[in-house]
Amino acid sequence: MKRVRVRRDHPYAPAWALVMLLVALTMYLVTEGVSAPGQQAALAPVEQVSWDIQPLSMSLVILSRAGDEATARIEAARYVARGAAGYVLPSSGEYLIAGAGYNSVDEAGRVMNKLGETEKLAASVATREAPEIAVRLTGKRAQADALIGAERALRDGTNALGEAAFRLDAGEIDLNGAREALLSVRAEAKKAREALEKASAGEPNQAAEEVAALLAAFEDASTTMLMGAGTSPLFFSSQMKYNYIDLRLRHIAFLSRLAGDG
């Protein structure tokens, strides 16, 4: 008698096979078809981006001059007590004591003339400027956009700082209003700096590093001013004018170096 072999069908075998097929397909998609976010950033195409940087200038109202730095700083302190910036600027063989900085020569000239009429002060005007620059950036689009945006944020934030100082002097805002303006521009500077650092991570760039450093200096200066307890409107205005001049001159120096490199 022939033996009859009975094959037992396993009811779960087809389902198990389907599960294994789905697992294999998923692994294929992960390893072959889908890139992680970091990989996507690394694979971003390199582009050439044109960056047209507008000229930047500052015209300083010079209240007095001194032959050495120590004398200049003593003289500057006298003007700080009156709400001026008291910024000491090295020049050819002397030190200039600046009372305030303005975006145009005409505006600085009007202030100079008014000081001569009302206070019999023999003031003068000194201008520092950087030319218009055409730069071609080579890199990822996100990096270029972050750098361009950061330079614009530095420019706009510094303008806002100077404007707040003059509005405080004119009585258009009070001390709290000036603090609020400073908080706002500090937040924008921080946002732009962090975006630039994130976009440039792992790929050092001299221009990006310098702009990030300037934005960090903006944040630090703003924080120092905001932490001043019991500050009077007059002294707060002096601090804002000082930092407005300092940040703008450092920005101009950066752009001048960039123009020289080009």
Annotate the PLM regions:
Residues 1-8:
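N-terminal Lys/Arg-rich, disordered targeting/topogenic segments
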Residues 161-175, 192-203, 222-235:
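Secondary-structure edge/capping motif, primarily at the C-terminal ends of alpha-helices
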Residues 8-17, 255-261:
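Intrinsically disordered, low-complexity regulatory regions
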Residues 38-139:
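Solvent-exposed beta-strand motifs enriched in subsets of small alpha/beta binding domains
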Residues 202-262:
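Extracytoplasmic/luminal low-complexity segments enriched in Pro/Gly and acidic/polar residues
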Residues 182-215:
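Mature extracytoplasmic domains of secretory-pathway proteins
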Residues 114-181:
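Charged, amphipathic alpha-helical linkers/stalks
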Residues 12-32:
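Hydrophobic membrane-insertion alpha-helices, especially the h-region
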